[in-house]
Amino acid sequence: MTSANPEFTVRRDVPQTMRDGTVLRADVYMPRGTGPFPALLERTPYSKDNSPECQVGSPPFFASHGYAVVIQDVRGRFTSEGRFIPFHDDGWGPNRDGYDTVEWIAQQPWSNGRIGTLGSSHNGIVILAAPRHPEVLRRIS
């Protein structure tokens, strides 16, 4: 499903398949224009469907300023498949969901390959696995 705003569009429940076949889902806020765009990633166990202003950075704000913003439900939470074990599949257990998601973003036609992350609390901890992908990850905040 896609919803529109004069400055950006939102693609809801976009699937990303992890290395073990588990499907995680994200909302992707896309700026107007042809791209490609730099991207910001936030992964959350608190539901990507919460008010966008509840996120660390406002996805509508960043999307209206030229960034693609990916807000993903972590494994086993809300719209994402799998079993939720805090931090287990984010890079410290057998799977590398943060890495796989950064890789997925980098391969999208709308991505220019420059990716930053956002997050505090649990959302901030799960992005710590992302530095394993230094060639595309530009900023962690």
Q: What is each stretch, according to the model?
A:
Residues 42, 103-141:
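Primarily recognizes the serine-hydrolase "nucleophile elbow" in alpha/beta-hydrolase
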Residues 32-107:
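Cap/lid segment of the alpha/beta-hydrolase catalytic domain
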Residues 11-13, 17, 21, 40, ...:
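Surface-exposed loop/turn and secondary-structure junction residues enriched for glycine/proline
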Residues 1-35:
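N-terminal cap/lid segment of alpha/beta-hydrolase-fold proteins
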